[in-house]
């Protein structure tokens, strides 16, 4: 492994580890969820982006390392000088645009999904809440079997296929490819974040669970089977929740998952 590749690997892992620490110790998101204050939204965006770095960076390591390798091959003349001046910049821009996609996604989820969702859930009957969350889980589970999911996960599983289709030279190319990779990743993973947001912003337990699932989907060559297995589980949980057999979210106590007999009345 070349020196620059080692630096990239260590940097991604270090940022991910630091972001996990930040996510564990971050402030409660509830005040931000009920407010459109720009300062609070900015704080949320920073916290959300740190959480995305924690969850997603381990899974994108193969993509970033291959990008660096392709840049090195492309810049075979005076490789050492070019690596120091351009390769690092392009890799940083590639990863940066990937994070920008997720940062904007977080703001969109907050304003268009979480705030109204929180308002509806907190004022609804527990049975209605069960149906709402059951519907979300069923919808997310069905998506795991769609052609769009299959296409997006294909590019995430195979970095080489992604670059063969989307390769673009220069700094602008790094920005463009980072954006496309972020969008493909979003297309692959958005149901998990829809669920995570609905059940509790940046809850460390859900973050860890979905991070493991995403890592399995992206790293394993049969990641689509991970996705479909998760889809089956989500649909099953959604049906049970809709029928009132389990409580996915208790709007009187907070996020929970328990048999209906233990439901708080």
Question: Which residues fall in each region the model found?
Answer:
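Histidine-/acidic- and/or cysteine-rich, low-complexity loops and terminal segments associated
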Residues: 1-50, 73-83, 117-126, 147-168, ...
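Hydrophobic alpha-helical transmembrane segments in multi-pass integral membrane proteins
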Residues: 108-110, 180, 184, 239-253
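A small-residue-rich subset of transmembrane alpha-helices
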Residues: 82-114, 189-222, 229-234
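Transmembrane alpha-helix/helix-exit interface in multi-pass inner-membrane proteins
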Residues: 103-118, 122, 131-158
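Membrane-interfacial entry segments at the cytosolic side of transmembrane helices
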Residues: 124-131, 222-232
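Juxtamembrane transmembrane-helix termini in multi-pass membrane transport proteins
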Residues: 45-99
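Alpha-helical transmembrane segments
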Residues: 39-57, 126-142
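Alpha-helical transmembrane segments of helical membrane proteins, especially in multi-pass transport
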Residues: 143-151, 173, 177-201
């Amino acid at each position: 492994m070349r020196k620059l590749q080692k630096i990239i690997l260590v940097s991604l892992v270090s940022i991910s580890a630091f972001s996990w620490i930040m996510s564990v110790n971050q402030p409660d998101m509830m005040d931000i969820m009920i407010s459109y204050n720009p300062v609070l939204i900015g704080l949320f965006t920073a916290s959300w982006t740190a959480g995305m770095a924690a969850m997603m960076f381990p899974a994108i390591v193969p993509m970033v390392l291959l990008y660096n390798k392709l840049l090195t091959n492309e810049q075979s003349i005076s490789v050492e000088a070019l690596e120091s001046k351009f390769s690092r910049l392009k890799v940083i821009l590639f990863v940066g645009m990937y994070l920008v996609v997720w940062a904007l996604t977080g703001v969109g989820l907050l304003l268009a999904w979480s705030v109204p969702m929180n308002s509806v859930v907190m004022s609804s009957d527990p049975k209605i809440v069960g149906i709402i969350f059951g519907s979300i889980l069923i919808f997310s589970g069905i998506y795991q079997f769609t052609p769009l999911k299959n296409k997006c996960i294909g590019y995430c599983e195979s970095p080489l296929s992604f670059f063969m289709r989307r390769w673009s030279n220069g700094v602008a190319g790094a920005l463009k490819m980072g954006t496309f990779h972020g969008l493909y990743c979003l297309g692959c993973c958005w149901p998990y974040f829809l669920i995570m947001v609905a059940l509790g912003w940046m809850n460390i337990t859900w973050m860890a669970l979905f991070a493991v699932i995403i890592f399995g989907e992206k790293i394993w060559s049969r990641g689509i089977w991970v996705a479909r297995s998760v889809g089956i589980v989500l649909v099953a949980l959604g049906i049970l929740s809709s029928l009132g057999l389990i409580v996915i979210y208790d709007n009187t106590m907070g996020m929970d998952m328990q048999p209906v007999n233990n439901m708080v009345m």
